[in-house]
Amino acid sequence: MKVGIVGAMAQEVEILASLIENKNVVHIAGCTIYQGNIQDKEVALLQSGIGKVAAAMGTTLLLQMFKPDIVINTGSAGGVSSGLKVGDVVVSTQTVYHDADVTAFGYAKGQLPACPPAFISDPKLTALVENVAEQQGINLTSGLICSGDSFINSAEKLAWIKANFPEVVAIEMEATAIAQVCHKFNIPFVVIRAISDVGDGEASISFEEFLPLAARQSSSMVLKILQSL
């Protein structure tokens, strides 16, 4: 099985990149792709850059150039679900854009034309993450992950997202764009993120402080999933 892994920032991919054997590195259009092996799995690890366009462009390149069988999105996220704390892990059941609004034409909030109301993560991959977390005693929350081209750093913005997407468990800036590309290419995907902040007025301070912890936690979870595939 060939596994595509996508992270936005250097800090979110550097642990996994350091573990790749027989490494080949490709730089293209502002993206970096590390290809090789982790354990017995063939992997292509993409550092896409931040935001929806960067994530979509990088994921498209990843799928076209390396033809992975599945895609895992890793990195950090802002926690929304009550009880989530820094370092906890979330896994997607579905993803949606919190900053897309074509409701004037009858679409659901977050839905784009020619797309489903939400992008559904591969149920088998989500279940695998849940099972591994249970076996390892990892605090995991499953649910809706919302994406947008904003770092949420205010209680007002967070409240708006929660009001419009009440099932949301975490927020970030790339997952739904990655999911949309995978949907178009018919490639199974799942999002595994660790919490770096809680999206309130202190989020930027928390993010800077706890990004390394979130990167370690999400990378560790991805490694456990690779072992289980």
Swiss-Prot record:
Binding site for substrate: G78, I152, M173, E174
Annotated coiled-coil segments of the chain: none
Catalytic site: E12, D197
Keyword Transferase: no
Name recorded for this polypeptide: 5'-methylthioadenosine/S-adenosylhomocysteine nucleosidase
Keywords on record: Amino-acid biosynthesis, Hydrolase, Methionine biosynthesis
Family stated for the protein in its record: Belongs to the PNP/UDP phosphorylase family. MtnN subfamily.
GO molecular function, one term: methylthioadenosine nucleosidase activity
